[in-house]
C-alpha cells in the first residue's frame, strides 16, 4: 500500500493542501459515517492493519507497505489490536490522533520532497491549522469550539435561532441553501457560517443543504450523510450514522 502516491504527486502548496483535505475527509468518513464498516474491518485476529486515507476521499484498512522504507510515510500500524481492549470512543479517538499525525507527516514529506521554502511551509501549515483536526471532529471538540465561538460573538442568543422554519411554519432541523431560502435572517446566516459538519468537519458549504441529528444535535452536510431535502421532509426524527450505529450495538 502506498497511501495513494500512485495517483499523483502534489508539487505546490495548494496541491499538497488539496491532497491533505482529500485524505482527511476520507479518514473522517471512516471514523464517523462509515464507522460500523470500519469497526468490522479492524478485526484484532488479523495481522497488523493500517487506516489509509486516499486523496480521492476514499479510505481503506490494509496491511502496511512491503517496501522498506516506503515511498510515503506510513500510518499507525496495528490499529486493530487495540480495538477490543478499549471502549469504542477511546479507540476511535486513538486512531484519530495517529491519523492526524500521519496526515501532517505526508504533507510535509511532499514539502521536503519538492523543496518548499520557509514561507511556503509556513503557509501550508497555516492552511492545515485552519481546519479542525480529525480528533476534534471525532470527539466533538470541533463542535464545542464552534459553539463557544458563536456564543462569544452572539452573546446569549438562543440555540433555537439556528433552526430555520419550513414554509408550513413548523420547526425543521434543516438548513436550506442561501438561494433557496432567502428569508433566513442575517444572524442565522452567521450561525450557518460557524457550523462545522459532524462528518467532514468543514464549516464551508453555506450554499448547501444541512441536517441536524435529533440525538447528538450535530449538523451535517446533506451530501455527507446522503440525505436530500426531499427525503428530509419525510423524516420525523433524524439520527446520524454514528448515533444509529451506537443504538444498533446497544
UniProtKB/Swiss-Prot annotation:
Expression sites (tissue/organ): Ubiquitously expressed.
InterPro entries in the cross-refs: Alfin, Alfin_N, PHD_AL_plant, Zinc_finger_PHD-type_CS, Znf_FYVE_PHD, Znf_PHD, Znf_PHD-finger, Znf_RING/FYVE/PHD
Coiled-coil regions listed: none
Molecular-function GO terms, alphabetical: histone binding; transcription cis-regulatory region binding; zinc ion binding
Highest taxon above the source species: Eukaryota
Role summary: Histone-binding component that specifically recognizes H3 tails trimethylated on 'Lys-4' (H3K4me3), which mark transcription start sites of virtually all active genes.
Residue ranges covered by zinc fingers (PHD-type): 194-246
Sites of N-acetylmethionine modification: 1
Transmembrane helix among keywords: no
N-terminal signal peptide: none
Domain notes: The PHD-type zinc finger mediates the binding to H3K4me3.
Name of this protein: PHD finger protein ALFIN-LIKE 3
Matching Pfam families: Alfin, PHD
Low complexity bias (residue ranges): 149-163
UniProt biased composition (Acidic residues): 179-192
SMART domains named in the record: PHD
GO biological process per UniProt: chromatin organization; regulation of DNA-templated transcription
Organism: Arabidopsis thaliana
Region (Disordered): 146-192
Similarity remark: Belongs to the Alfin family.
Amino acid at each position: 500500500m502506498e497511501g495513494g502516491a500512485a495517483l499523483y504527486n502534489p508539487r505546490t502548496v495548494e496541491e499538497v493542501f488539496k491532497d491533505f483535505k482529500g485524505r482527511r475527509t476520507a479518514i473522517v468518513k471512516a471514523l464517523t459515517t462509515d464507522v460500523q464498516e470500519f469497526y468490522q474491518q479492524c478485526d484484532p485476529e488479523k495481522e497488523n492493519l493500517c487506516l489509509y486515507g486516499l486523496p480521492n476521499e476514499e479510505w481503506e484498512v490494509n496491511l502496511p507497505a512491503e517496501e522498506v522504507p516506503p515511498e510515503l510515510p506510513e500510518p499507525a500500524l496495528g490499529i486493530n489490536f487495540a480495538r477490543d481492549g478499549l471502549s469504542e470512543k477511546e479507540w476511535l479517538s486513538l486512531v484519530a490522533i495517529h491519523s492526524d499525525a500521519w496526515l501532517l507527516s505526508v504533507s510535509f514529506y511532499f514539502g521536503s520532497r519538492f523543496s518548499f521554502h520557509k514561507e511556503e511551509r509556513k503557509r501550508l501549515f497555516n492552511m492545515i491549522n485552519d481546519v479542525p483536526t480529525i480528533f476534534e471532529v471525532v470527539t466533538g471538540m470541533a463542535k464545542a469550539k464552534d459553539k463557544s465561538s458563536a456564543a462569544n460573538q452572539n452573546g446569549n442568543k438562543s440555540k433555537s435561532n439556528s433552526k430555520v422554519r419550513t414554509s408550513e411554519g413548523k420547526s425543521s432541523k434543516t438548513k436550506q441553501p442561501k438561494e433557496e431560502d432567502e428569508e433566513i435572517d442575517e444572524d442565522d446566516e452567521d450561525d450557518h457560517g460557524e457550523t462545522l459538519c459532524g462528518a467532514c468537519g468543514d464549516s464551508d458549504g453555506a450554499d448547501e443543504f444541512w441536517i441536524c441529528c435529533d440525538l447528538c444535535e450535530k449538523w451535517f452536510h446533506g451530501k455527507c450523510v446522503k440525505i436530500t431535502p426531499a427525503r428530509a421532509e419525510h423524516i420525523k426524527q433524524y439520527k446520524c450514522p454514528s448515533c444509529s450505529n451506537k443504538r444498533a450495538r446497544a
